[in-house]
Amino acid sequence: MIKVLFFAQVRELVGTDATEVAADFPTVEALRQHMAAQSDRWALALEDGKLLAAVNQTLVSFDHPLTDGDEVAFFPPVTGG
């Protein structure tokens, strides 16, 4: 299983802070695409190009490989003022 965490606006849009999915996705991008297909709100929350990802608490690119037991976090880019 892969544990998926959502933070900030992503969490608000998907309506949960975490979920678990089968370890059937070779990359972070494959997982993102699968989850974005669940509904319009999920698609908006996980929109390509407006999201960062971390695997096991390390910032990664979306072509990063996934394995069983990984923890993936999706969150919006941090902005400051």
From Swiss-Prot:
Gene Ontology cellular component terms for the protein in this record: cytosol; molybdopterin adenylyltransferase complex; molybdopterin synthase complex
Q: Where, per the database record, does this protein carry Glycyl adenylate? A: G81
Q: Where is this cross-link: Glycyl lysine isopeptide (Gly-Lys) (interchain with K-119 in MoaE)?
A: G81
Signal sequence span is: none
Q: Which UniProt keywords apply?
A: Isopeptide bond, Molybdenum cofactor biosynthesis, Nucleotide-binding, Phosphoprotein
Tell me how the protein is altered or processed after translation: C-terminal thiocarboxylation occurs in 2 steps, it is first acyl-adenylated (-COAMP) by MoeB, then thiocarboxylated (-COSH) by IscS.
A Gene Ontology molecular function term of the record:
nucleotide binding
Q: Which CDD domains match?
A: Ubl_MoaD
Q: In which pathway does it act?
A: Cofactor biosynthesis; molybdopterin biosynthesis
* Induction section of the entry: By anaerobiosis, repressed by the molybdenum cofactor.
UniProt cross-references to SUPFAM superfamilies, sorted A to Z: MoaD/ThiS
At the top level, the lineage of the source is Bacteria
**Which residues are recorded as modified (1-thioglycine)?**
G81
A GO BP entry is:
Mo-molybdopterin cofactor biosynthetic process
Matching Pfam families, A to Z?
A: ThiS
Kindly give any further remark recorded in the entry: The cross-link is not seen in all structures of the MoaE-MoaD complex.
Q: What is this protein called?
A: Molybdopterin synthase sulfur carrier subunit
Protein source organism = Escherichia coli (strain K12)
